Amino acid sequence: IQLNVKGMLNLEQSFWNYIQTEMLEGDNKYHAEGYGLQDAEKGVVFEKFPPVLHLQLKRFEYDLEKDMMVKINDRHEFPLSIDLKPFLIQEAQHEPWVYKLHGVLVHSGDLHGGHYFALIKPEPDSNWFKFDDDRVTPATLKEVLEDNFGGEMVPPGGINRHPSATAPIRAMKRFTNAYMLVYVRESLMDEVLKPIGPADLPDYLSERIEDERIQMEIRRREREEQHLY
């Protein structure tokens, strides 16, 4: 699902915006076959959501005034948990539709370039990790949420500066923000995120992992032998 960021304070507002109906009337009437032009309502309704929900935040879009593509760095908040029941048809609302955040894909940079990395919570009760190229490091909730909302930030030292300072604090625009979110339905969490054992891996992947392990062992031995001389 592609959700608007511009003009939206948070993920919930983006969902309400997505299902908002549009009136087709006046010069914009709907052409109904056999009935000609008719006043109508145009909109989207959700009958259900998948076990794993991928939400693309529209950080890149075409600016009519500038006649060019731009990156939207506006602040847009997203939660660790969201109840999507209000956005479903009435018939589906007897089920629980709470979703938990388990993945954040981030772009750091501008329209013309930048860097991509991911923040992932691999298990229901695990910590968060940052996957940045070949580096995997633990991540805090601040790194997952606040650091990727976009908008502006107070520069380092701005909050704790000396009381006698009189110059105004200038906020800095953030160019690092989330562009895709991955939520997992809470009631299906154990099934979606169940542990993967050796039997679940395809042969080609098991062989590749073993080859990489052997190569790492060879390089380790070579380094140890070099130290002997």
Which residues does each predicted region cover?
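Exposed substrate/partner-binding surface patches
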Residues: 1-229
